[in-house]
């Protein structure tokens, strides 16, 4: 019997890196709302009293970026200098240029149309916005077909934020982190080993008599009651440093794109390295990673495997992927090559087809920027749909 421990973490919406992600995606949404064909690549850096926004944008609309920044930060909960940051009074600097015409050329007129003479299919006209490799993953450990460690870490982080916002534990502040360690036997989750919760809090809050008991009662225990695995002997560590009064941008500078493992599968699956937030769907870093999750989830939903990881790769300016790889880690009901062939029959992985099939030219991205881009049953993400599972099964059967 092979036993191992696996750990994943999540962070709340008030973590400085997540503030940056949400600001970048809020700016993206504001542009897509009025001009769905906007090209956007926006990075945010946030530190004590300051927010810096930079990037490249081509759009027909006007967005008051400073107002978008302030509104998002205030919604997160940083609305007072007593909390270490105030969205209403912080400094906001903006440095935005236009998208490089060299990049635009490859996206607007793909290599297939420009060089290879393929003009009959409109989907061949849009090239990938960059080269790169993207991964998607799904497994049957949870109803949402996500790995249990990251799924539970996200649930705890969402609840930590919820009890702050609804006043149940009103002395909490927006910055927080959760971490979950699960024991596996023969590849299956069997026991919760350790939970770590760190939360920023108001001054003069006693850890042992107030904070730790409140976190246990209102955050941790309600989630553990829903688990189907053993919690016997589990450890709970709350604010292990002893104090967490200084948090958010005052405690650490935040940057867009620094929580790519939290955004995806908690380290349980491979990652191509590209961040998501602040990027419109012409950037395959984002859209193709969403598509790979869609593919992998449909493979598992179809019962073709209990674990599935899919890699796709693109060349900048080309519409068709240059590589596709399906791996089921020995859990496939048929050979991986057969599943891969079925994927190519059922899914069109050209960038324009992904944007069309997943309806990505919409202002939907700010809600993805905290608590994970995948496995969100409370949100209606198109890449979480399993409506192509039957088609995959039929394609495998031939």
UniProtKB/Swiss-Prot annotation:
It is an enzyme of class 2 (transferase). PROSITE patterns: ADOMET_SYNTHASE_1, ADOMET_SYNTHASE_2. Mg(2+) binds at residue 17. Residues 99-109 are annotated as: Flexible loop. InterPro entries: ADOMET_SYNTHASE_CS, S-AdoMet_synt_C, S-AdoMet_synt_central, S-AdoMet_synt_N, S-AdoMet_synthetase, S-AdoMet_synthetase_sfam. Its cofactor is Mg(2+); K(+). GO terms for cellular component: cytoplasm. GO terms for molecular function: ATP binding; magnesium ion binding; methionine adenosyltransferase activity. Belongs to the AdoMet synthase family. Homotetramer; dimer of dimers. Catalyzes the formation of S-adenosylmethionine (AdoMet) from methionine and ATP. The overall synthetic reaction is composed of two sequential steps, AdoMet formation and the subsequent tripolyphosphate hydrolysis which occurs prior to release of AdoMet from the enzyme. This is S-adenosylmethionine synthase. It comes from Parafrankia sp. (strain EAN1pec). The lineage of its organism: Bacteria, Bacillati, Actinomycetota, Actinomycetes, Frankiales. The gene is metK.
């Amino acid at each position: 019997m092979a036993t191992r421990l696996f750990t994943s973490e999540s962070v709340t919406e008030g973590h400085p890196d997540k503030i940056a992600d949400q600001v970048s995606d809020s700016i993206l949404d504001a542009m897509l709302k009025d001009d769905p064909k906007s090209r956007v690549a926006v990075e945010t850096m946030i530190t004590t009293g300051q927010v810096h926004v930079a990037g490249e944008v081509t759009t027909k609309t006007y967005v008051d970026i400073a107002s978008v920044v302030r509104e998002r930060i205030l919604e997160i909960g940083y609305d007072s200098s007593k909390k270490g940051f105030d969205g209403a009074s912080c400094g906001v600097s903006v440095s935005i240029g236009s998208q490089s015409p060299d990049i635009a050329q490859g996206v607007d007129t793909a290599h297939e149309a420009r060089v290879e003479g393929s003009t009959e299919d409109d989907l061949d006209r849009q090239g990938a916005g960059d080269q790169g490799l993207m991964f998607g993953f799904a497994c049957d450990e949870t109803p949402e077909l996500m790995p249990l460690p990251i799924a539970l870490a996200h649930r705890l982080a969402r609840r930590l934020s919820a009890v702050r916002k609804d006043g149940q534990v009103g002395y909490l502040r927006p910055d927080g982190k959760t971490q979950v360690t699960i024991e596996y036997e023969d590849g299956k989750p069997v026991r919760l080993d350790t939970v770590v919760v760190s939360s920023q809090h108001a001054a003069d809050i006693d850890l042992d008599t107030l904070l730790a008991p409140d976190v246990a009662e209102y955050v941790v225990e309600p989630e553990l009651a829903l688990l189907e695995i053993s919690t016997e002997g589990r450890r709970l560590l709350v604010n292990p440093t002893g104090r967490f009064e200084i948090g958010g941008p005052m405690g650490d500078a935040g940057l867009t794109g620094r929580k790519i493992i939290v955004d995806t599968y908690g380290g349980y699956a491979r990652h191509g390295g590209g961040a998501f937030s602040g990027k419109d769907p012409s950037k395959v870093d984002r859209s193709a990673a969403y598509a790979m999750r869609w593919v992998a989830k449909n493979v598992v939903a179809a019962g073709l495997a209990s674990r599935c990881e899919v890699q796709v790769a693109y060349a900048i300016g080309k519409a068709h992927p240059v590589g596709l790889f399906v791996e089921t880690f020995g859990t496939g009901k048929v050979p991986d090559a057969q599943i891969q062939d079925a994927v190519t029959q059922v899914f069109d992985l050209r960038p324009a087809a992904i944007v069309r099939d997943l309806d990505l030219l919409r202002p939907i991205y700010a809600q993805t920027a905290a608590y994970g881009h995948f496995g969100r049953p409370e949100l209606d993400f198109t890449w979480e749909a399993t409506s192509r599972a039957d088609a995959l099964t039929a394609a495998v059967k031939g």
